[in-house]
Each structure stands twice: as C-alpha cells, then as structure tokens.
Regions:
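Structured alpha/beta or helical-core interaction and ligand-binding surfaces enriched in interleaved
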Residues: 1-98
C-alpha cells in the first residue's frame, strides 16, 4: 500500500491509535478496524483488528515489538452468528498510554 493511501486511511483513525495503525499498515498488516479505547469508545483498551491467515498475527506482533509498541494481547477471534462460528480475524490490544 502506498504512503498516500495509508495517510488517507489514517485520517479516519482515532488520534490515540493512529500511529500504531500507520506503523502496521506501512509494514503490510491489513488492518480494517481500530479504536483508541476508553470511555465512550467501542473498546475499553486501544485495539486494532486485522485480516490474515494463521501466521499473520505473529508477524504483526513482531512488527509491533520491533517498534517497541506495548502489546497486551494478541487474539485470534471467531464470533458465533446463528449458532455458527464466523471469522477468524486477529485482534491486537495495546496497553493504554494515559
């Protein structure tokens, strides 16, 4: 993904997680949802969701750790819709910086 597209996407991202999303995108992680977390937000903690096969979460974690981002959790997520598992996708949860 080129820098112009990354900057365009990041213009819609919560300020408190924008740098993390930008870093992941610049390193080829296909993010699709993020939230800086906290009161009044969709998540309690800063969270980024991204697409990828089994190994992608570990690759994204390596990117985050290499750049000294404070990751609290890495999850592979399936939700149950109408009794059937749907997914999977990845979630990376960061330690809040407040």
């Amino acid at each position: 993904m080129d820098k112009e597209r990354i900057n365009e996407i990041c213009g819609f991202v919560d300020k408190g997680i924008r740098d993390k999303v930008k870093l992941l995108l610049e390193n080829g992680v296909e993010t699709y949802e993020s939230c800086e977390g906290g009161k009044g937000h969709a998540y309690f903690e800063p969270t980024v969701r991204f697409h990828g096969e089994r190994a992608e979460g570990f690759r994204a974690l390596s990117v985050a750790m290499t750049h000294r981002l404070e990751v609290r959790e890495l999850k592979r997520v399936w939700v149950i819709n109408d009794g059937e598992p749907t997914g999977a996708w990845w979630e990376m949860v960061f330690i809040p910086t407040k």
